[in-house]
C-alpha cells in the first residue's frame, strides 16, 4: 500500500486492447463478470478498475477459500459459465493460495473448465511449472494493465 502511494503504478490500459475486447463483446454473447481473488486491497482494486474499464463486472474476494466458496455456491445455482467469464487470482494468499484454488477448481465437476489466470508479483521457472501442474490457463505478472487486458481478451475470445 505504501509503495503504491509513493510510487504509483500506471494503470492505463491501451486503447487498442479496450477496442479489441469491445469488438469481441459485440460479436459474441459473453458473460461480463470476472471473479478476482487477492489478499492485497491495493492489488484487488487495481485489477478491478482495469476489468471494469473493459466493461466487465467484478466479484472481488480476499483469498482463495472465499473465491472457491463463492464459485461453488454459484455452480449450485446453475452453470458457472452462464455467470462468470473467468477467474483472476493472486498466488500468495492466506486460507487458500492461488495454486490450491486452481487445483480445486479443476477437481470440481461444475467448475473444471473455468478459465483461470494466476496474477502475481512472484516470477521464475518454479512458478511456471506450478502453474502448469495445477492447470491454470495463464500466468501474468503484477501489475501490467496491457498484459492483464491481453489475458482477458484471450480468455473471452477462446
What is each of the regions a protein language model found here?
Residues 1-25, 54:
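C-terminal catalytic ATP-binding subdomain
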Residues 45-53, 65:
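Charged docking surfaces used in two-component/phosphorelay signaling
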Residues 55-62, 68-71:
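Short hydrophobic/Thr-rich beta-strand motif most characteristic of the beta2 strand and flanking loop
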Residues 63-66, 82-85, 97-101:
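Acidic catalytic/metal-coordinating carboxylates
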Residues 89-90:
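Active-site T/S-Asp motif of two-component receiver
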Residues 93:
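Receiver (REC) domain active-site loop signature in two-component systems and cognate sites
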Residues 100, 107, 112, 122-141, ...:
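Alpha4 helix (beta4-alpha4-beta5 surface) of REC/receiver domains from two-component response regulators
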Amino acid at each position: 500500500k505504501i509503495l503504491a502511494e509513493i510510487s504509483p503504478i500506471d494503470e492505463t490500459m491501451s486503447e487498442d486492447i479496450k477496442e479489441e475486447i469491445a469488438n469481441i463483446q459485440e460479436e459474441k454473447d459473453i458473460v461480463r463478470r470476472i471473479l478476482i481473488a487477492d489478499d492485497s486491497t491495493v492489488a484487488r482494486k487495481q485489477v478491478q478498475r482495469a476489468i471494469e474499464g473493459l466493461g466487465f463486472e467484478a466479484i472481488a474476494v480476499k483469498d482463495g477459500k472465499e473465491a472457491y466458496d463463492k464459485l461453488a455456491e454459484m455452480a449450485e445455482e446453475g452453470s458457472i459459465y452462464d455467470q462468470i467469464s473467468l477467474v483472476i487470482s493472486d498466488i500468495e494468499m492466506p486460507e487458500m493460495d492461488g495454486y490450491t484454488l486452481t487445483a480445486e477448481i479443476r477437481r470440481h465437476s461444475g467448475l473444471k473448465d473455468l478459465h483461470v489466470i494466476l496474477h502475481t508479483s512472484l516470477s521464475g521457472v518454479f512458478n511456471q511449472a506450478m502453474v502448469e501442474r495445477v492447470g491454470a490457463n495463464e500466468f501474468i505478472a503484477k501489475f501490467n494493465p496491457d498484459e492483464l487486458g491481453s489475458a482477458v481478451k484471450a480468455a473471452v475470445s477462446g
